[in-house]
C-alpha cells in the first residue's frame, strides 16, 4: 500500500467513531499494538524533542524501505506515534519525504490535542521525515 492509501484507510477508520472519546479509546488501542522499540534504542539520540511526554523513535533501512519502532510513556502519545508509524513504516525514504500529512487534519487530531501535544505531533512528523532524509542520502 502507498502512504496515501494507508492515510485514507486511517481517515476512514476515524470517521466510523461518533465522538472524540471513542477516537481516543481507539488511539489507545493502536498504541497497545505499536511495534515497540528495543530497549537499547531508548536513548537521548532517539527521543523526540518538543514532546510533553517521552517518545522514542528508531528507524532501520531494510531493502530500501524504512521500518520504524517506537515507544512512549503516555498512552495517548503512544497512540499518536502508532498512527504515524502505520502511515510511514515500510515505505521508501523518498516517499516519506514527499508525503503529505494532511490526513492528521482530516481526522481532526491536531484540534483535539493540547497545544503541547500538538507541538509534539509536529515534532514526531519532523523526526520521521529527518530519518527519511538521512537514509535517502545514504541511498543516493
Over which residues does each language-model region extend?
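Alpha-helical support elements that line or immediately flank enzyme active sites
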Residues: 80-91
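Short small-residue beta-strand/loop micro-motif enriched in glycine and branched aliphatics
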Residues: 65-69, 78
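N-terminal intrinsically disordered, cationic/polar leader segments
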Residues: 3-54, 61-65, 104-140
Amino acid at each position: 500500500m502507498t502512504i496515501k492509501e494507508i492515510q485514507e484507510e486511517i481517515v476512514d477508520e476515524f470517521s466510523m467513531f461518533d465522538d472524540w472519546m471513542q477516537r481516543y479509546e481507539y488511539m489507545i488501542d493502536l498504541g497497545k499494538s505499536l511495534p515497540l522499540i528495543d530497549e537499547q534504542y531508548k536513548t537521548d539520540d532517539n527521543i523526540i524533542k518538543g514532546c510533553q511526554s517521552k517518545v522514542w523513535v528508531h528507524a532501520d533501512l531494510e531493502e530500501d524501505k524504512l521500518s520504524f519502532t517506537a515507544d512512549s510513556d503516555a498512552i495517548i502519545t503512544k497512540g499518536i506515534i502508532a498512527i504515524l508509524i502505520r502511515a510511514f513504516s515500510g515505505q521508501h525514504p523518498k516517499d516519506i519525504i514527499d508525503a503529505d500529512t494532511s490526513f492528521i487534519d482530516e481526522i481532526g487530531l491536531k484540534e483535539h490535542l493540547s497545544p503541547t501535544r500538538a507541538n509534539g505531533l509536529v515534532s514526531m512528523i519532523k523526526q520521521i521525515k529527518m530519518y527519511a532524509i538521512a537514509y535517502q542520502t545514504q541511498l543516493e
